Amino acid sequence: MSAIIELKKVTFNYHKDQEKPTLDGVSFHVKQGEWLSIIGHNGSGKSTTIRLIDGLLEPESGSVIVDGDLLTITNVWEIRHKIGMVFQNPDNQFVGATVEDDVAFGLENKGIAHEDIKERVNHALELVGMQNFKEKEPARLSGGQKQRVAIAGAVAMKPKIIILDEATSMLDPKGRLELIKTIKNIRDDYQLTVISITHDLDEVALSDRVLVMKDGQVESTSTPEQLFARGDELLQLGLDIPFTTSVVQMLQEEGYPVDYGYLTEKELENQLCQLISKM
């Protein structure tokens, strides 16, 4: 599958007198239809990277290629039409008096016909389970509902790429998991490419690949399973250790023959059943 996003040796500084560049020769690609999670400590360059992809910042050197086109000042608006952004705080994203108005806002700015806008808004709200709230004021929604509306606003624009900048970080665990599953379903149904900046293990686990950033560089790229198998190193990368990984480590220390690496809860359950049956 071809790459829809590619960064080649991208360097960026916010200030000319910086001791270290914010991004230092960053190179990676994202395949069409892929879900890539980007993790790393604060200041590692995660948010700067996605702002370069969306054309909000311009690299000092290197190139950013989106959907086959080199991102330049002349085509930046064309590129942005292909990208939907959802940020951490949903309250900063609302501009409409009602949910319906808010989702329609971007479409109206593009000059889309009224009937098409109505159809797109209804479809987008249905995808995120918010069709019964379209007459509500955004201020009266819960945090999870607000983020669903923000995602609907992005999806209604029919982008090829959705970027989530810690979009689930302000939600409670239940709301976070529900939102992640909603995004996954939309991604699977419409073959959208998803990039998520996150510290959430559930979000990382649903990714196809994980890119780890450290000090403005790409530290590694791997599958979620390979990442979780790094054990205690995860703490240094800004992630918690998954519950199943902790259990596996504990069993191994006690001498039990459990497979090394990350296991889902179901896989761990199966291994424990096998161990018990041999006792």
Swiss-Prot record:
One annotated GO molecular function is: ATP binding
Has keyword Coiled coil? no
The main location is membrane
- One Gene Ontology cellular component: ATP-binding cassette (ABC) transporter complex
Q: How does it sit in the membrane?
A: Peripheral membrane protein
Keywords assigned by UniProt, alphabetized: ATP-binding, Cell membrane, Membrane, Nucleotide-binding, Translocase, Transport
| Domain ABC transporter span(s) in chain numbering | 5-240
- PROSITE patterns registered for this protein in UniProt: ABC_TRANSPORTER_1, ABC_TRANSPORTER_2, CBIO
* Superkingdom assignment: Bacteria
Disulfide bridge partners, by residue number: none
Q: Which SMART domains match?
A: AAA (SM00382)
E.C. no: 7.-.-.-
Q: Where in the cell is it found?
A: Cell membrane
> PANTHER family of this UniProt entry?
ENERGY-COUPLING FACTOR TRANSPORTER ATP-BINDING PROTEIN ECFA1, HEAVY METAL TRANSPORTER
Q: Which family does it belong to?
A: Belongs to the ABC transporter superfamily. Energy-coupling factor EcfA family.
What does the UniProt record say this protein does? ATP-binding (A) component of a common energy-coupling factor (ECF) ABC-transporter complex. Unlike classic ABC transporters this ECF transporter provides the energy necessary to transport a number of different substrates.
Q: How does it assemble?
A: Forms a stable energy-coupling factor (ECF) transporter complex composed of 2 membrane-embedded substrate-binding proteins (S component), 2 ATP-binding proteins (A component) and 2 transmembrane proteins (T component).
Return the protein name: Energy-coupling factor transporter ATP-binding protein EcfA1
